[in-house]
């Protein structure tokens, strides 16, 4: 029996203030000023629920908790839902693609 495809990749816009974090800047040497800064993740939850959990500090990434502004569904909705393995691979692929476009990207 095939497993239900219920995993999601999601992208959260981060405030430009995240650029004051040295670790974020070091991980994004090809960042193009003016491009968005984002967090890319994957979850078995609805992306809206996962974003709310990040902001509430529940299993959250510090950059999302402190700098997260909103979800960017135009960058991920076409992919979802998918299997765990597909989501794991797609999360990496989306991060690489966005970095290649000059975005500042954080992935846990």
Ranges and model annotations:
Residues 45-48, 52-108:
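Aromatic/basic micro-patches that form nucleic-acid/chromatin recognition or nuclease catalytic surfaces
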């Amino acid at each position: 029996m095939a497993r239900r495809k219920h995993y999601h990749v999601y992208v959260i816009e981060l405030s430009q203030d995240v650029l004051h974090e040295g670790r974020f800047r070091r991980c994004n040497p090809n960042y193009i000023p003016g491009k968005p800064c984002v967090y890319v993740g994957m979850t078995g939850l609805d992306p809206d629920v996962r974003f709310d959990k990040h902001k509430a500090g529940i299993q959250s990434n510090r950059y999302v908790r402190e700098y997260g502004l909103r979800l960017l569904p135009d960058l991920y909705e076409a992919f979802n839902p998918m299997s765990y393995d597909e989501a794991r691979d797609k999360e990496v692929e989306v991060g690489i693609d966005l970095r290649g476009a000059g975005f500042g990207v954080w992935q846990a």
